[in-house]
Amino acid sequence: MSAEPLLPTHNGSQGGEVRSPDQKFIVIRFSDVSVRDLQLNISNVPFSNINTHWLRRMCRELRPQQTQKRRLKFIRNGSILNTHSKIAEELTHYFDTANNSNVATGTSVAPEQNNYYIHCIIGTEELTQAELANEDLKDDATPSNDSMTTQAIGFDRLRSVGFTEQEIELLRQQFRATYGDLEEEEERLAQNGNRDDEGHDIRQLEEQWMESGSGTAQGNGAGGGNEDRFNSVPIANIKHNKDLLLGICVGFFFGVFGILLMKFDGLFNRRQKMAIFAGVIVNVMFCLVRGF
């Protein structure tokens, strides 16, 4: 974990310190994958003080280089957050549900269960001081999720609440990067001439993510185990690693013949082809080293 203070008044876990099971965190996951996740220790922070204004202040204090003067929009499981969002109630419900579930099963609290994930979209335009001062009002001026157009599905719905094309594309890239098999399925169906159907299927997955937050604050908590299934999946999907390993091995052991295999449609996906090319380069380098 980063050695920087998670809050101005509280120092988070340092170096090899063991994280206490009682500690609670808000994890800000940015749409720009080059910006690492921001963990905010809220163990000693009253939930009533946590709102979008507080989240923006924390982001700009702890990630100033990437967020200063940028428009910041927050999403929780597809729900756009504003000053009217009941973040305090959701935090209480989330952590109470996790705690009650562990008490019922007699298990200890896993570190991941104490993480409450919020997505942050970093805007591309720079805001003036006046616009920064009225940023919360801009959130309130956007339509609610219930008033979004029903014709568009998935992340395309965000256009109706003021998101730019670039911001939507950043969010979509992060979503697809998390699930590497989506890219593979896209290529497979595109080769079969079913690209339009596949695009609709992926939009449906995006729609499921957009709507997944609507029922998590209700009921008896039976769905608590799946509440963060989209958020807690690591960005580096294991399927990516398998494709890279397969491609590098094919390129290294088959050499130039591996490039010929790339000509067969449907045999390798795009990620595997890139890895094959890298494997061929490694093969050539070994040949040069042995030659000398």
From Swiss-Prot:
Sorted alphabetically, the Gene Ontology BP terms of this entry are:
endocytosis; protein transport; protein ubiquitination; ubiquitin-dependent protein catabolic process
Glycosylated where? N11, N41, N77, N99, N145
Q: Which Pfam families match?
A: Dsc3_C, Dsc3_N
Kindly provide the name given to this protein in its UniProt entry: DSC E3 ubiquitin ligase complex subunit 3
Q: Could you tell me the superkingdom of the organism this chain comes from?
A: Eukaryota
**What keywords does the record list, in alphabetical order?**
Endocytosis, Endoplasmic reticulum, Glycoprotein, Membrane, Protein transport, Transmembrane, Transmembrane helix, Transport
Q: Which residues lie on this side of the membrane: Extracellular?
A: 1-243, 292
Q: Which residues lie on this side of the membrane: Cytoplasmic?
A: 265-273
How is it placed in the membrane, per its record?
A: Multi-pass membrane protein
Q: How does it assemble?
A: Component of the DSC E3 ligase complexes composed of at least TUL1, DSC2, DSC3, UBX3, CDC48 as well as VLD1 for the vacuole-localized complex or GLD1 for the Golgi/endosome-localized complex.
Q: What does this protein do?
A: Component of the DSC E3 ubiquitin ligase complexes that tag proteins present in Golgi, endosome and vacuole membranes and function in protein homeostasis under non-stress conditions and support a role in protein quality control. Involved in endocytic protein trafficking.
The answer, when asked if Ubl conjugation is one of the entry's keywords, is: no
- Entry's InterPro entries? Dsc3, Dsc3_C, Dsc3_ub-like_dom
Q: Metal-binding as a keyword?
A: no
Chief location bin? endoplasmic reticulum
The UniProt transmembrane annotation reads 244-264, 274-291
User: One GO cellular component from the entry?
Assistant: Golgi membrane
Q: Which family does it belong to?
A: Belongs to the dsc3 family.
Q: Where would you find this protein in the cell?
A: Endoplasmic reticulum membrane
